[in-house]
Amino acid sequence: MEQNGRLDVAALQAIDVHVHIEVDLHGHLALPDDQAQAAAKYFGADHRRPTLPEIAAHYRERRIGAVVFTVDTEAYTGHPAISNEEIAEGAAEHPDVLIPFASIDPAKGRAGARAFRRLVEDHGVRGIKFHPSVQDFAPNDRSAYPLLEVAQEFGLPALFHTGQTGIGAGLPGGGGIRLELSNPMLLDHVAVDFPHLTIIMAHPSFPWQDEALAVATHKPNVYIDLSGWSPKYFPPQLVRYANSLLQDKVLFGSDYPLITPDRWLADFAKLEIKPTVRPKILKENAVKVLGLGASPA
């Protein structure tokens, strides 16, 4: 599934743009254990944390490409992040299925932006992931702007968590996590300030689904991934827009390992999506956003 160091897009049935690396090769977790356990309980997941090589094998078996990343929350939680370099190097060992994104805490400022530039230039990183609620920043407060400047310069997408999160769910005070920081309307500001940056709003953005649809409809550089929810629970307005106005701007994402691609795809097959739109969501839109070349007919 790989040609000359790149994904062989024609060999893939789909591209999953939202896959978490939750543990590194040394057993270090991406999040504090109590927050990770809360998320697993929220999703009814089995608490299993596959390693990067295991994820590669899982996706290769299914002929699915996967965008992989961690979430750097070190400044807010004090928990050291999984190495972006390790993820990028691991993805380079599995170029037929894995596409690496970085995650850098916006609190790291210009130093973080320099680190991101090195990851792009020296390690082949293809985008950046943010989780405003867990990283404790508002997307429009400019703290992430040095990182976004680098992403825009290189033409790389920025993936932002939006809506409610399972991380910290049920813990006292929600583990200190503020949901309002993941309101997709905050990304409307970012889309104005970075008109040439590709922005992906992750997840059906409960309780702000209509806001997310409005931003994605109004701003040509804003997309939506469908991760974190089984398609059978998608709000009707999301399905309606995915079938019409946003058919070229909606992307398959699972949120693995919390939701498996098998479960997501099985439920998506039962969703009332137009036959002409289905391949766009599963692969073609991701090919465009990730700069993987023309998708074959």
What are these regions (language model features)?
Residues H18, I87, P100, I128, ...:
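Conserved, mostly hydrophobic/aromatic
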Residues G65, T73-A169, R178, P296:
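Active-site gating/metal-coordination segments in enzymes
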Residues A30, R126-G127, N140-L251:
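Catalytic pocket-lining loop regions of alpha/beta-barrel enzymes
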Residues R49-R60, A81-A88, A92, R110-E121, ...:
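Amphipathic, non-transmembrane alpha-helical secondary structure
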Residues L25-L31, P80-A81, A113-R114, G170-G173, ...:
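Short aromatic-enriched loop/helix-cap "lid" or pocket-rim segments at secondary-structure transitions
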Residues M1-V17, D24-E61, G65, L246-L251, ...:
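Mid-to-C-terminal alpha-helical segments outside catalytic/metal-binding sites
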Residues H20-L25, T73-Y76, P106-R110, Q164-G168, ...:
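Active-site environment of divalent metal-dependent phosphoester hydrolases
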Residues V19-I21, T70-V71, A102-P106, K129-P132, ...:
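A cross-domain feature marking catalytic cores of carbohydrate-active enzymes
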